[in-house]
Amino acid sequence: MRILVTNDDGIYSPGLWALAEAASQFGEVFVAAPDTEQSATGHAITIAHPVRAYPHPAPLHGPHFPAYQVRGTPADCVALGLHLFGPVDLVLSGVNLGSNLGHEIWHSGTVAAAKQGYLFGLSAAAFSVPLNGEVPDFAGLRPWLLRTLETLLRLERPFLVNVNLPLRPKGFLWTRQSVRAYEGVVIPGEDPMGRPFYWFASRPLKEAEEGTDRWAVAQGFVSATPLRLDLTDETRLQPALAQE
């Protein structure tokens, strides 16, 4: 099996290499990741200028995989990775430093990279871990990455799955995407030159429902949510068609 690994945190993120190492237990791994952080870029692709890529040097310690650092978005990395390395069977994105739960998947570059692989007809999965004031222990998470990959590879292909791991998992659950309602917050500030700037932040307004991704992670479970790209609202489409 040939596996392409990418992320949105950038080529130097420890989560990227933790996922690549785990994936190497299942096949031949190739890496194409942004040369700088691309968090919250969503499914943006670069069309206004050329995308550049450079071979990434082998690390001094640990396993080495053929790798390119890409001056582009996560979706760019998948498209270019398939060109540079040739056909693959599986696209993995992550492990993102920060959760991608509920409506967060709309702006997630991590999930978008997996979606890009799925758009090419490939099986794909996004992996994320929350940041709750402590650095993720990827060595401790390794058994759960392996177990989750084993589970995903038993699915009918192609598949698209969003995976979120708590910092200390106690089990694995299949979940549905939560509907996360936000209160948008704009935090103003002023730089030393007296110029205004703004931070965008948000606070959740609703508790997570049981069986959802956010609920599962809060309870200490690895959450795996199957996704689809067809966004058609059938409940509204059918009445609309009936009115014609």
UniProtKB/Swiss-Prot annotation:
The keyword Zinc does not apply. Its cofactor is a divalent metal cation. It is found in: Cytoplasm. A divalent metal cation binds at residues 8-9, 39, 96. The keyword Hydrolase applies. It catalyses: a ribonucleoside 5'-phosphate + H2O = a ribonucleoside + phosphate. GO terms for molecular function: 3'-nucleotidase activity; 5'-nucleotidase activity; exopolyphosphatase activity; metal ion binding; nucleotide binding. Gene3D superfamilies: Survival protein SurE-like phosphatase/nucleotidase. InterPro entries: SurE, SurE-like_Pase/nucleotidase, SurE-like_sf. GO terms for cellular component: cytoplasm. Its EC number is 3.1.3.5. Belongs to the SurE nucleotidase family. Nucleotidase that shows phosphatase activity on nucleoside 5'-monophosphates. This is 5'-nucleotidase SurE 2. The gene is surE2.
